[in-house]
Amino acid sequence: MISCSFIFSPAEYDAEFLELDAKIESFAAALVGFVGVDRWVSDDGKSRNSIYYFDAMDSVRELSRYPEHLVAKANYRKWYLGYQIVVSEVVGSYGDGFFQHPSQINKD
């Protein structure tokens, strides 16, 4: 499993951003291999993290080539003060079974 953390500081969102964001979210969720997404906001609201989970890197590559994603990436300065992407291989995930999370790969 692959996780892609999109860590960012938001600026102002406009109608163009909201439309692109909705299209990108819909495309990502429809990809073969999409597992889920997890989102976090810092206590002060200045930092956010959207973590997307996929079965394989092929899905990540497909998302990265999506035309609307490329438009958003080219115009990111309009909507973000800064960002960092962290792509990781999830080698394990565990819990007590009472908290559902996209990274639960050990489901037995």
Identify the residue ranges that each predicted region occupies.
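Short S/T/G/P-rich N-terminal loop/turn motif that feeds into the first structured element of a domain
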Residues: 1-48, 58-65, 81-108
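Short, flexible helix/strand-to-coil boundary loops that buttress conserved ligand/catalytic motifs
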Residues: 64-67, 73
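Arginine/glycine-rich "motif VI" loop of SF2 helicases in the C-terminal RecA-like domain
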Residues: 75-78
